[in-house]
Amino acid sequence: PIIVSFEVSTNRWFAKGTKVNDFELANTIKLANSENSINGTKRINGETWSTQTREVTIFPQKAGTFTLPEVNIEISVNTEHDGIVEGSIKTQQQNFTVTLPKALANIEHFIVSPMVELNVTSNAITHKDYAIGDAVSIEIEVISQQSPAMMIPPLEHPIINGISIYQKTPKIFDTSNRGQLVGKRIESIT
């Protein structure tokens, strides 16, 4: 993922949270509610300034050059003489490039994650002869760290002559583990 940080600062203090207005970026997925908020301070020319940083996580869907558009940011500052002053500022366009590692050049489906876990459970009995009409259920769970569930591609099930496959609607959901996004996709077939 790409994390875009928007930082604003004042030599006073903020009256309320800074808001980064929504923006579109073609061929990317920007998660709803992915905006993280960080309040802090820093020293500028010997003075302490208050800062508010907003981070937005973006998942590019292909390699190439992207142009982050101008983004409108709404701020509210407590001033010394004029009370609360509200306004907005715009960022400048920024370009960034996404490249696909050579190892993935000919791979159609992959998961971008530092850690992927695969769990398979089944009611199949090893070394059993199955008869016509017997059913075996399999549940496949894919868990990806730091990647939303929507980025886990659907599993492909081969067509086998004489065998019917019935697939339930996949369960797809995201959770957070100590502030880290965890995506999970569960597919059940019989």
Residue ranges and their predicted role:
Residues 1-190:
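Surface-exposed interaction/ligand-binding surfaces
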